[in-house]
């Protein structure tokens, strides 16, 4: 089910009018001072420190896992949408660094397009939250992989990060700090204590939020949707970090992480000693975010939208309004060689992102001499069959359906033959093959949309105007960023 359809069926808050109505909420009393201390430790640009004033009006929040060099480009597109919305209403724009996430497979790879080759760095990260992984053991490998880019002042600053999540936060500050983007790392020593009261409250009734999620999941399922979140009997929405990060279960007045049992008193003591060891699961994280931040708007991707849609009951449980939800910008970057190729074939780059090789074949046939004439002949043949079918129907009405099936088979076989002809022609044409492979490397690397593979920092390092092109882009929908 599409995100927008789901939003309408569930009556989820969306749009700039709702964003304005959500302004003025108060965040945690110590939020501004804690954030200021965190940002000063990271030596954040003055524009970011000045942006803290916007917290008095409210916040537009987005977030992402702490990927290498900022993670895939969609990270910057989320930030751009949040910055644009915040600017419209005079609020602050915050980026939630998902430092509590321990799915290292999502963050241990860095893919770069260098000299027309997809190069990959894969770090052997331990299965720990990103905020617990020291960056020092991997710094030299990243520096060597980046080559001369590691000497860029922005990258050199980011490489000073002490943890994986700090490397990510510093990357955001280095490339988007001048726009006032405020990173927020919930495991940072200055910020983790802000969640203590929320965690204490969750421990008082540890199954209530899980039950609220399951109830909303049933509602979505009844409407024809496929809710991604579901809690097993006894499962809470809390993780406890010991030697690993494990989900807590609750039964008969006690908690267990599958290794040992804990009383509520023991967990409260752990919380008071080190509040970063108790962390919310996906079904609770946005609500905890909004208990601490004065969130008015929340920028998400399509997949995130589906799980946030299940949280209406959890927001009600905590007595706070769900923020206005916005889908992030989608964008594709065209470097000069790729821009020339799409112009040559009059190919819509988004058609290629969506359709891959088939979209290229469709564009190629428009410029191949003789192919359009052959396609026109097929269309004329189909028109003749249509006319023949009408004559047959006049003589014998029962023949209408067989003629319709005959025409459909002829059309399908004709299209398959034309596609085979195109592929055969392309197999003999080195230029066409070269252009197709180049389009794949740039727009569909690893078979995925560009925005999910390459970091936007790569484009910013290669093209000085890249950040300006992003700043000029719309804040929603689809954008094509032409560089060079």
What feature does the model see in each segment?
Residues 70-73, 86-105, 323-324:
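Glycine-rich phosphate/pyrophosphate-binding loops
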Residues 72-74, 103-110, 195-199:
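Short acidic, glycine/serine/threonine-rich loops at helix termini
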Residues 229-296, 300-313, 322-324, 329-331, ...:
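A translation/RNA-centric and nucleic-acid-associated enzymatic feature enriched
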């Amino acid at each position: 089910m599409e995100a927008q359809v789901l939003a309408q069926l569930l009556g989820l808050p969306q749009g700039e009018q709702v964003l304005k109505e959500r302004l003025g909420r108060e965040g945690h009393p110590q939020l501004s001072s804690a954030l200021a201390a965190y940002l000063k430790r990271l030596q954040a640009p003055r524009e970011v420190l000045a942006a803290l004033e916007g917290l008095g009006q409210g916040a537009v929040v987005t977030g992402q896992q702490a990927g290498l060099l900022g993670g895939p480009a969609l990270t910057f597109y989320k930030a751009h949408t949040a910055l644009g919305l915040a600017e419209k209403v005079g609020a602050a724009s915050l980026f939630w660094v998902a430092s509590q996430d321990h799915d290292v497979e999502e963050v241990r790879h860095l893919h770069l397009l260098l000299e027309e080759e997809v190069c990959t760095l894969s770090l052997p990260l331990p299965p720990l939250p990103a905020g617990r992984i020291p960056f020092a053991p991997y710094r030299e490998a990243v520096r060597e992989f980046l080559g001369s880019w590691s000497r860029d002042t922005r990258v050199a600053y980011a490489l000073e990060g002490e943890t994986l999540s700090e490397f990510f936060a510093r990357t955001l500050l280095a490339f988007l700090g001048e726009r006032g983007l405020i990173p927020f790392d919930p495991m940072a020593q200055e910020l983790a204590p802000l969640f203590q009261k929320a965690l204490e409250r969750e421990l008082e009734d540890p199954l209530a939020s899980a039950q609220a999620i399951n109830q909303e999941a049933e509602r979505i399922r009844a409407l024809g949707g496929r809710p991604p979140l579901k809690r097993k009997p006894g499962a809470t929405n809390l993780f406890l970090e010991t030697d690993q990060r494990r989900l807590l279960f609750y039964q008969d007045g006690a908690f267990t992480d599958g290794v040992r049992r804990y009383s509520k008193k023991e967990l409260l003591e752990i919380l008071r000693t080190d509040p970063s060891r108790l962390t919310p699961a996906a079904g609770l994280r946005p609500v905890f975010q909004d208990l601490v931040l004065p969130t008015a708007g929340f920028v998400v991707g399509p997949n995130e939208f589906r799980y946030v849609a299940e949280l209406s009951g959890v927001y009600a449980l905590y007595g706070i309004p769900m923020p206005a939800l916005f889908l992030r910008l989608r964008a594709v970057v065209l470097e000069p060689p790729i821009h020339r190729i799409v112009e040559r074939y009059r190919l819509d780059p988004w058609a290629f992102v969506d359709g891959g090789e088939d979209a290229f074949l469709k564009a190629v046939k428009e410029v191949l001499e003789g192919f359009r004439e052959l396609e026109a002949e097929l269309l004329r043949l189909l028109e003749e069959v249509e006319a023949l079918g009408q004559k047959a129907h006049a003589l014998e009405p029962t023949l209408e359906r067989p003629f319709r099936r005959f025409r459909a088979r002829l059309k399908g076989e004709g299209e398959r033959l034309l596609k085979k002809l195109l592929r055969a022609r392309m197999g003999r044409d080195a230029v066409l093959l070269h252009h197709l492979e180049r389009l794949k490397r740039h727009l569909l690397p690893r078979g995925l949309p560009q925005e999910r593979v390459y970091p936007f920092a790569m484009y910013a390092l290669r093209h000085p105007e890249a950040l300006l092109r992003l700043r000029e882009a719309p804040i929603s929908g689809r954008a094509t960023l032409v560089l060079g």
